[in-house]
């Protein structure tokens, strides 16, 4: 079964993503900050990380840079309100394969 890590500090969006992806049969670990995400990554292998950029204890760019060397096969997709082209470029440079802006 596919394992997904959701790193999103908006509790409602976090729960909505978790609910819908679990309905589709995915195993979800959802966290609200970078520290807890880093801890989860030490003990789990995820196929996908859905990652917000603006987190209360750090940013998604730095977390993505930590993920990729240790978990090169893990796909990272940014899901963020940051919609500037420069933000997207930073996301791809950090190792993400896609960048989705939320309203």
Where are these regions (language model features)?
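N-terminal/domain-start alpha-helical segments
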Residues: 1-103
